């Protein structure tokens, strides 16, 4: 696919990134498979629909970020955690093939809203207002860590805040369906900031519809 698109920087990532050995081109369950690349598109649309609903810009897609998400999804299919192999911001989710937005947004927004209300008596924050409030109030994440749990682990609001960041402008998303850990599918959502071109993540952006 990337070869057909002339996306040399994406090919470079797939072939030469730090954890390239976790990617198996030709494996139908690998994040490089066309089926799994197509499977990620509704999830990208879901993210953009939510951002639009709270007054934020929709994210554009770049092939380089898609490639980073592919490499990260394949790595995190095997290792429970972030690969840290790229200078992108990343959300990960493990599930049985469902949209990760409820994990990243719906669940964590509920934690965020409750923490903000209990700590500061504030309600109704969404979008940029929620992101800005978090930046100026340092106690929210630690409160959530201490008072909420997800599958036995301390909860976070970091994935939610990543999705609603006003600073990001570009994304890539990938699904690995090998199910190495507990039969889970692995979703990786990688982003780059608006106006930041240091590593070329924002080169030749297109809309999700154009990508599809």
Give names to the regions the model predicted.
Residues 1-90, 101, 160, 166-178:
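Short, well-ordered surface patches within globular domains
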Residues 86-205:
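A well-ordered secondary-structure block
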